[in-house]
């Protein structure tokens, strides 16, 4: 066996060990209560995310009723979840605002939610372009005069993409809207489905120019199936609806979708054998799909899966009542370190005899971050938990660290730059910038390197080390 083959074997074994029940349980830190409110605080639906993370920063959104009707709130951590800012109220009206979704791209934070200030529920949007320090005024995205709900959003290359479901046509359909300038101006909305049954709970992921959407659909009759469609031109045109499940007599519902390069991962709840979490993936950008498989190991009820991916690692959380404490649920977790080929065992994250609902997951560097809604304090509050070493580096990344490195930073364009630069093919990866004295100035995704910096000379390297730093210049 040559040296490189031995390295790969050892790294494979170490990655699998990191997802073993003993190791993963030991690495998870204690639960942290994020909200202290006199009324209910709640995270959002699982088709979207209530938490986002990049580098040292972690961002959380939720809604709560401390002010009466329900408002959207936000808070952040700049030290990887160790300490947290005070709550920031994002909405202020006399009607219900709830079920928020968040997405992070560099220093820009995008939030969408369901809002009833126009009497019927509509989709609203708000952004921060400076990491949450300040927030711009809201934008109304839907004008359905029916029920618009369950938004999910993503962003890449200054394009913000939002999907949701609304019933303006008589039954719920999936709608899409995009902004080409980072959320300042929005193009008209577009219906992605036109089916005889309801289409609900869309989940969107973006990789480069490719958009991927999954949702639950009742067009086949009284039971829901998981459907998928994609755009390969940033949302300008869309391919056909593709049915991914075929269970007929049982529901497939509550999908959650994550994308990494050409890998598309989808999980959902299935009613077969009570309620299990099922998984399907495509490794060619949606051209073909693996068989669907059940990946939870329980006869209890499982709901609301949330999925995240970074490198070769796929992470999953869900709510679970396998301990027969119905109606109480616990939050469970599992991961795959090889792009979804094999999955580690189920890991229990919460141990309080109360309701733990609506989990959401994010990954940054080696850290896995989870938030959920919890009733242990007598009313619903938002709780947080992290695993500081829960995202092991991929085999490829570790092999590069041992000598087989690829210096992708030399592809950065333009250089010098005025606003920001990009690294083609590495838009979602994280890179660290240092000033000329060697001080770290920030972490950026490959799609918006250097945004918000003053003019000057900087040095760029991939998060986690590896390739030699690259000199970059920002002008004006």
Question: Predicted regions span which residues?
Answer:
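Bacterial N-terminal signal peptides that target proteins for export
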Residues: 1-10
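Composition-driven detection of intrinsically disordered, low-complexity segments
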Residues: 8-9, 246, 386, 402-405
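Bacterial N-terminal signal peptides
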Residues: 9-20
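Local alpha-helix boundary/kink/capping signal
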Residues: 18, 83, 134, 420-422
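Extracellular, repeat-based ectodomains that mediate carbohydrate processing or recognition
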Residues: 25-392
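C-terminal outer-membrane/trafficking sorting elements
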Residues: 398-476
């Amino acid at each position: 066996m040559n040296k490189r083959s031995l390295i790969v074997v050892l790294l494979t074994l170490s990655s699998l060990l990191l997802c073993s029940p003993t190791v993963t349980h030991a690495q998870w830190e204690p639960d942290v209560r994020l909200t202290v409110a006199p009324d209910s605080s709640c995270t959002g639906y699982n088709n979207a995310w209530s938490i986002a993370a990049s580098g040292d920063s972690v961002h959380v959104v939720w809604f709560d009723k401390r002010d009466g009707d329900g408002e959207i709130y936000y808070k952040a951590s700049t030290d990887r979840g160790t300490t947290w800012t005070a709550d920031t109220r994002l909405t202020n009206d006399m009607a219900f605002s709830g079920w928020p979704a968040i997405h992070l791209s560099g220093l820009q934070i995008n939030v969408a939610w369901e809002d009833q200030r126009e009497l019927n529920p509509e989709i609203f949007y708000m952004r921060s372009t400076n990491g949450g320090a300040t927030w711009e005024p809201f934008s109304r995205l839907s004008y359905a005069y029916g029920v618009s709900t369950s938004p999910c959003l993503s962003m890449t290359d200054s394009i913000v993409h939002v999907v949701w479901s609304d019933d303006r046509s008589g039954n719920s359909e999936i709608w899409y809207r995009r902004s080409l300038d980072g959320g300042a101006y929005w193009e008209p909305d577009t219906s992605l489905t036109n089916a005889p049954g309801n289409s609900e709970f869309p989940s969107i992921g973006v990789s480069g120019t490719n958009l991927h959407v999954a949702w639950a659909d009742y067009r086949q009759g009284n039971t829901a199936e998981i459907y998928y469609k994609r755009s390969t031109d940033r949302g300008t045109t869309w391919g056909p609806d593709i049915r991914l499940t075929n269970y007929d007599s049982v529901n497939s519902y509550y999908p959650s979708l994550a994308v990494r390069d050409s890998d598309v991962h989808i999980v959902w709840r299935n009613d077969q054998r009570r309620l299990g979490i099922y998984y399907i993936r495509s490794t060619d950008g949606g051209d073909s799909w693996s068989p669907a498989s059940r990946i939870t190991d329980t006869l209890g009820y499982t709901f609301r899966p949330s999925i995240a991916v970074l490198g070769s690692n796929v992470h999953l959380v869900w709510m679970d009542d396998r301990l027969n404490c119905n109606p109480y649920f616990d939050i469970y977790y599992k991961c795959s370190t090889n792009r979804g080929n094999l999955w580690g065992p189920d890991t229990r994250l919460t141990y309080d005899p109360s309701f733990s609902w609506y989990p959401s997951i994010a990954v940054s560097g080696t850290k896995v971050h989870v938030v959920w809604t919890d009733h242990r304090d007598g009313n619903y509050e938002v709780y947080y938990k992290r695993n500081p070493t829960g995202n092991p580096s991929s085999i490829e990344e570790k092999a590069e660290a041992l000598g087989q490195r690829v210096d992708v930073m030399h592809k950065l364009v333009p250089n010098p730059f005025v606003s920001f630069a990009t690294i083609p093919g590495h838009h979602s990866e994280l890179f660290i910038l240092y000033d000329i004295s060697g001080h770290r100035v920030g972490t950026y995704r490959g799609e918006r390197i250097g945004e918000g910096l003053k003019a000057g000379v900087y040095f760029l390297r991939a998060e986690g080390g590896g390739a030699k730093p690259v000199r970059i210049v920002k002008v004006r």
